[in-house]
Amino acid sequence: MGALLTILAEVFELATATGLSAEAILTGEAFTTAELLQAHIANLVEVGELSVAEALAATEVTSEAFEALQSISSVLPTAFIGVAATEGAILGSLITLTATSSALYPSTWKHSTPSANLNQEMALVPYIGDLDIFFPGAETISRFVYSIDPFRWASYLYNIVGRAVWEHLFRETRRQIAYHTTDIAGRTAQSIHHTIANFLENVRWTVSHLGTNLYSGLHNYYRQLPPLNPPQSRELARRLGVPQPDRQIFEKGEEGMKHPVSAEYVEKYGAPGGAEQRVAPDWLLPLLLGLYGDLTPAWEAEVEEEENEQDEEEYEPPQKRIKRTAKSSSKVNNKRGDRSARSPYRTRQHNHN
């Protein structure tokens, strides 16, 4: 087998160097081509009085390819056929011997058809994983020790390796999907924050005053309205012979000027010195930094102060327990009290015999 592989390796190297196919080298066509090329080069050297390098350049053949063609032997196809026949006979005898011994060996293993394969119309086979009761991998080890069929160990090993590869790919796929999903969500949030910040930087800001009282706003609106509606104004103008008012006059006024804008625009300044950097006014800077996750020192101090106030409101110090002592009672008279039913202030009577 080693000789056959060596010859094949040499054939592929010659095919790469000469530009000929491996089939041409094995069939002997390359040897005929090499002889014709050598004869043509020799003719150019002798008749044309050229050097070998000039003859190779005239025939557009490199020196490496010419040397490789000279190394091709005419007996290469015969040697390859002999080696291949010898290897084929050896491998055939080994395969025959293996098949005979496998057939004559008494097999005690039962290979019953699984119940899942009895249903030929079923497209998928249900998979039930190993139930490792003692420790992870116990069923796999016990199967290797007690349940390996020596005649089908290759297919069983292929099944185990395929299952391990599939489980690894499944876990890796889930991990990659979770990672990329989180990454996309983070980048999307960053892009949204960046878009909002650019919008707030480039937008035109105005300072306006909103009415605090709805009724006062309605009062001013109706007070500024003309006393006549548009049809009455046109009829009055037609009778007086003056130009009839139209929509533009109502919107722009009698002098053709627009009403003043009810707001003041914030002047926008560019980057100093033409640096083309991002600029923002001071009152807008905390909002932009907050979108990017940063806080100014003043804003951070205010946030910490509010958090401390909330913590103090939520935290209630435990009330001190006051130890109550028993009230001092009046002293008890040591004299024995009168327990009889008679009056304690009775007079004693003495019996005189």
From Swiss-Prot:
* A cellular component annotation (GO) from this entry: host cell endoplasmic reticulum membrane
Region annotation (Disordered) maps to: 301-353
Q: Name one GO molecular function term.
A: DNA binding
Q: Which domain of life is it from?
A: Viruses
Q: Which Pfam families match?
A: Polyoma_coat2
Acidic residues composition bias: which ranges?
301-316
Q: Where is the lipid attached (N-myristoyl glycine)?
A: G2
Q: Where is this motif: Nuclear localization signal?
A: 318-327
Give the residue spans that cross the bilayer.
279-299
* Ranges where the record places region DNA-binding: 302-353
Give the InterPro entries listed for this entry: Polyoma_coat_VP2
Q: What are the boundaries of the region D1?
A: 262-297
GO biological process, alphabetically ordered: symbiont entry into host cell; viral penetration into host nucleus
Keywords carried by this UniProt record: Capsid protein, DNA-binding, Host endoplasmic reticulum, Host membrane, Host nucleus, Late protein, Lipoprotein, Membrane, Myristate, Transmembrane, Transmembrane helix, Viral penetration into host nucleus, Virion, Virus entry into host cell
The family annotation for this protein states:
Belongs to the polyomaviruses capsid protein VP2 family.
The protein depicted here goes by the name: Minor capsid protein VP2
* Organism, scientific name: Bovine polyomavirus (BPyV)
Q: Species lineage, top-down?
A: Viruses, Monodnaviria, Shotokuvirae, Cossaviricota, Papovaviricetes
